Amino acid sequence: MVFGVFLLIILFVFIIILMVHVKKTDAVVFSDVLSCSYREKVSVDRFIRKLDGTLLDNYWVDTSTVGKKKLEIQYKNRYGFIEQKKFEIEVKDVVAPIIVVNNPYTVVEGEVSDLLDVIFCADDYDDGVKCVISGEYDLNRIGQYHLKIEAQDKSGNEAEKEFTLNVVKKEKKSNSSQVKYTDFKDFYQKYNDSSVEIGLDISKWQGEVDYAKIANEGVSFVMLKVGGQTEIGGEYIVDPSFDDNIEGALENGLKVGVYFYSYAKSEIEAKKQARWVVQKVKDYELALPIAFDWENWARYSTFGIGFRTLNKVAESFIEEVKRYHYEGILYSSKYYLENIWHQDDYVKWLAYYNEYNEIEDDYFLWQVCNDGKINGINGSVDIDILKVR
């Protein structure tokens, strides 16, 4: 009996000594550099230099915002005990603002009031990035001016570009050039197979559409402009041809989706636009998504927002239409989808006027050209390819 008690005491003391030893042992050594970049894909083990044990959850770190981040790891040490360690990292904005300006850059005499309004200058993270043009110039006087534009974000990242500004006289438009079209019949024969469908996107600019004729030509779907915003902060206007277009399309058995042309610069405004669209389409059957069409790149600087805010705007629109059980997609051209938009989780509608190929498999819809010619529409129309899902 006494011997048994003695053994228990010895065992208890051994466990206490072991636990103290474990606590004193520096089982985790963190990296010397506890930082990463904004939107960098990094897992928590990136910040561990040495671990005397097994990491239980090597999770992805949230790098969607800049600043200090408190993290915690859970691991099993070499003695089998589960331990936790807290530490702090910093997510940094290390990317300079983007300046896009042709060299030379040409404007028509008297047509631009502020040069900074028409030069693309923005930051990946910060709103209201500071852009400055140095050098003398006169937008109301014909001539050449050698200038430099500089930009700096709140993290101190800088960018600059030198360019020549050409202020020129307005020229009369020539009507001598012959308009070229992409014949829909040729396009259909070239690309139609069991993996895709061929369709059009249509707005008031196509005038009165004969949907029976375009359906007979092989069109299986249309993306219709439901409406758009008039300007930054402007009202929402229904496309004048929308009702006729959607009724004509549905009556002739075409699949229908819609798009909204937006000037939104906040999440609140984007959600409001999404609800407006839902109200306009709720009495119709949509087989295809609602697209968010934001393409105000020529005067992007006037919006005063960074790409992070712009992406939140698109995300808000798409998520809001989802709340009403519609699918939301993002429409944009190839350059902006690859360089500005970060919407990896969303379905995309690509505008890219090139030969269609299956390599571009990240896209659900592909607007292949804007000069289509088809029986049933006077003038040109955009032709699209839809992947069969």
Question: What are these language model-derived features?
Answer:
Residues M1-D32, V66:
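Gram-positive cell-envelope targeting signals
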Residues L18-D52, V95-D127:
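Solvent-exposed, low-complexity, repeat-rich "mucin-like" stalks and linkers
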Residues R46-K85, D126-F163:
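Serine/threonine-rich, repeat-prone extracellular segments and beta-strand-based repeat modules
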Residues E90-I98, N166-N175:
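Extracellular interdomain linker/stem segments of modular secreted and single-pass surface proteins
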Residues S174-G199, Q343-R389:
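Functionally critical loop-and-helix segments that line ligand-binding/catalytic clefts
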Residues N192, V196-D210, A215-E217, M223-K312, ...:
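Substrate-binding cleft of extracellular glycoside hydrolase catalytic domains
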Residues L286-I359:
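Catalytic domains of cell-wall/extracellular-matrix polysaccharide-remodeling enzymes
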